[in-house]
């Protein structure tokens, strides 16, 4: 494997974006990960959805007090995708929202795939059975935007759209929040991660003092996520 080759040749590796499972990162002392905590992104996404559901009665399309939701998931087996889905849904429940999963689809982090998958999901929720989708949970902003594309292409009026939430805080995602097409997004501090990777790489390359690096367990550098909704979207500017 790459990690075996790196260890055999004494070449440290800094991983980012896609987090290795703990067992793999522990295989050698010079393997590091810089990124955000996927569980935190899921928690914050769940909080956005739960807060909106409790504050805005219009989100509960059939008025049953239950948040019927669909999930657009990233790559199958991707650690971040699994964690984001689990924590977003569990957080809604912990915030006192009763939930019902109507469906899910793997869209591989891709906007076009998400549009196709969301369009297929929407055909299942025409109200004839009393089931209507209240919230669409996207593992990232691109898939959330794909869900919005599907809603725009449907004959569903905007006031009847499900609430859509995403993760990453991309420029287009932030614009969708401003336009009230998304309930909110969870901002991923990519600039902070780039700085931390550079700092860590410099310290490793120069055999410097790692005490200046905010390492967790000697291997992880975490940058915090934060919520962006219409109430605080100006913070993104």
Role assignments for model-derived ranges:
Residues 133-135, 149-191, 195, 199-217, ...:
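Exported/periplasmic ABC-transporter solute-binding proteins
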Residues 33-64, 114-115, 169-173, 189-209:
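Hydrophobic alpha-helical segments within soluble ligand-binding/sensing domains
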Residues 68-71, 93-111:
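Short beta-strand elements in bilobed, periplasmic/extracellular small-molecule ligand-binding domains
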Residues 19-23, 39-40, 75-79, 106-111, ...:
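Solvent-exposed loop/turn segments at secondary-structure junctions
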Residues 2-40, 44, 58-68, 170-178, ...:
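Flexible loop/hinge segments that line or gate small-molecule binding clefts
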Residues 1-10, 87-88, 102-175:
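Hydrophobic alpha-helical
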Residues 41-45, 79-98, 113-117, 146-150:
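Short, solvent-exposed amphipathic alpha-helices that sit
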Residues 65-68, 72-76, 80, 91, ...:
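Hinge/cleft segment of the Venus flytrap/periplasmic-binding protein
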């Amino acid at each position: 494997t790459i990690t075996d080759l790196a260890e055999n040749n004494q070449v440290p590796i800094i991983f980012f974006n896609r987090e290795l499972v703990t067992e793999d990162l522990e295989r050698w002392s010079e393997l590091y990960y810089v990124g955000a905590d996927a569980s935190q992104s899921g928690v914050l996404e769940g909080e956005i959805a739960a807060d909106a559901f409790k504050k805005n009665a219009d989100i509960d399309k059939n008025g049953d007090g239950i948040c019927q939701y669909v999930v657009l998931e990233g790559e199958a087996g991707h650690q971040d995708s699994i964690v984001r889905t689990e924590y977003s849904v569990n957080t809604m429940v912990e915030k006192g929202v009763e939930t019902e999963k109507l469906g899910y689809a793997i869209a591989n982090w891709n906007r076009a795939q998400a549009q196709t998958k969301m369009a297929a999901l929407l055909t299942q929720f025409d109200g004839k059975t009393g089931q209507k989708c209240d919230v669409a949970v996207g593992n990232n902003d691109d898939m959330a935007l794909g869900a919005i594309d599907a809603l725009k292409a449907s004959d569903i009026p905007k006031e009847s759209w499900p609430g859509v939430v995403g993760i990453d805080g991309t420029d287009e995602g932030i614009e969708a929040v401003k336009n009230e097409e998304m309930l909110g997004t969870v901002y991923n501090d990519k600039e902070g991660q780039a700085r931390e990777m550079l700092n860590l790489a410099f310290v490793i390359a120069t055999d410097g003092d790692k005490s200046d690096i905010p390492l967790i367990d000697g291997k992880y550098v975490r940058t915090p996520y934060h919520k962006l909704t219409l109430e605080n979207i100006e913070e993104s500017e």
